[in-house]
Design a protein with these regions (language model features):
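Bacterial N-terminal signal peptides that target proteins for export
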Residues: 1-9
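Gram-negative bacterial Sec-dependent N-terminal signal peptides
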Residues: 10-16
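N-terminal signal peptide c-region/cleavage motif recognized by signal peptidases
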Residues: 18-20
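C-terminal outer-membrane beta-barrel translocator/porin domains of Gram-negative envelope proteins
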Residues: 25-28, 36-40, 86-90, 105-109, ...
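Gram-negative/organellar outer-membrane beta-barrel architecture
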Residues: 25-185, 284-285, 345-349, 353-369
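Hydrophobic, well-ordered secondary-structure elements that form the walls
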Residues: 293, 314, 336, 350, ...
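Short Gly/Pro-enriched loop/turn and capping motifs at secondary-structure junctions
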Residues: 300, 315-320, 339-343, 355-358
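A short alpha/beta connector and helix-capping loop motif
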Residues: 324-336
């Protein structure tokens, strides 16, 4: 399973602006709109991630949601010293009620660390020993078939290409060779099922989010044997008060791979999307699991927005056949959040997570989940 993506949350959240303007009505509300986007986030291994983009929205005849949305964004990470470029499209009109999505990406941010394979790998060497300079290219069209208003099935082909140099002195170079290093291309198919009843995506207070994704790759291009992966994730949100004064957020997820898998497609746990307080891609295995809990409290309502605090606890691990380990890697911490102009879609969160390996700071739009 490839590492979870790191799209700039601010750029994604701001695509809602066009729909909100149309909902307000007015003579120009339904005209095509092009909106500039700006975003930033911070995590220890990526550094300061700065992004710019643009979203173009077109509507049917006085109808929501938009018939077409086109998004282009580019981001640069100061810590990883690399970039990410995304171009995406959402097309509703040609295939109603089916939705066509097209995603293309060129990125050096998808895979930045490698510590070896297993649940007990050590991280005591200098940071440079674990760095990976991998560039990934992705082309991924898919169709989404609504089964209900909140449940949808997606399916489509995948084309991936990765270039990974084996820099001297790194774990990747000294403990290899690893299948998938160098230049590696793969072609496959992805299918997913998603249930989403959340009231907001950036800062949910109520609802559930369930997703299951399977990927399969035949022995085509550089893949010498077929391989595949399956992953699942579930989150739920329980709140008191309206607007919420306290929210308990829970999430659990896991993944497994089968077949002869290139090293970048293993299951990875650690970092800002799974277990905070650990480095990105800290632990690699053929199976993995993680869990997260956050308690988010409203501290006060100020003229410019709502402010609050939250506590967090993360846990996760991986499994490989040749290793017998019963250790779960855990981290705990807390942080502050601000909902600008009292709107949850404008939520900024700052989190500090402490693990046995380090204390890490994360700044992002919205919450981790």
């Amino acid at each position: 399973m490839a590492p979870l993506t790191r799209r700039l949350p601010l750029l994604v959240a701001m695509t809602l602006v066009g729909g909100e303007m149309a909902a307000q009505g007015g003579p120009d509300a339904w005209r095509p709109q092009t909106v500039p986007l700006f975003g930033a986030s911070y995590s220890p291994d990526i550094g300061l991630l700065l992004g710019v983009g643009v979203v173009h929205t077109r509507y049917g005849f006085r109808a929501l949601p938009p018939s077409t949305q086109l998004l282009a964004e580019a981001a640069y990470a100061t810590g990883a010293n690399t970039y990410r470029i995304d171009v995406a499209g959402e097309f509703r009109r040609p295939l109603l009620p089916t939705i066509l999505y097209v995603e293309m990406r060129a990125s050096g941010l998808e895979f930045t660390r490698f510590y070896g394979v297993g649940n007990t790998t050590v991280g005591s060497q200098p940071d440079s020993a674990y760095r990976v300079r991998q560039t990934q290219l992705l082309v991924a069209p898919r169709v989404a078939i609504p089964l209900t208003s909140r449940l949808r099935f997606t399916v489509g082909p995948l084309l991936k290409y990765a270039h990974t140099p084996g820099d001297p002195g790194t774990v990747l170079a000294t403990t290899g060779p690893y299948y998938g290093a160098g230049d590696f291309g793969q072609v496959g198919v992805r299918a997913g099922l998603e249930l989403d009843t959340r009231d907001h995506t950036a800062a949910p207070a109520r609802g559930v989010h369930l997703s299951m994704v399977g990927q399969g790759y035949p022995a085509v291009w550089d893949a010498v044997h077929p391989f595949g992966s399956v992953s699942a994730e579930a989150s739920t949100y329980l709140s008191a008060g309206d607007p919420p004064s306290a929210t308990l957020a829970l999430r659990a997820g896991g993944a497994a791979v089968s077949g002869t898998v290139p090293f970048q497609e293993l299951v990875y746990v650690g970092g800002g999307t799974t277990v905070r307080g650990y480095a990105e891609q800290r632990f690699a295995g053929r199976r993995g699991a993680y869990g997260n809990v956050e308690l988010r409290l409203l501290a006060g309502r100020l003229p410019f927005g709502d402010v609050g605090i939250f506590g967090l606890a993360d846990v996760g691990r991986v499994w490989i056949p040749a290793e017998s380990s019963d250790r779960w890697h855990a981290a705990a911490g807390g942080g502050l959040w601000l909902a600008w102009q009292h709107r949850r879609v404008n939520t900024l969160s700052i989190a500090a997570a402490r693990s046995p390996e380090r204390t890490a700071i994360y700044v992002r739009i919205g919450f981790m989940f």
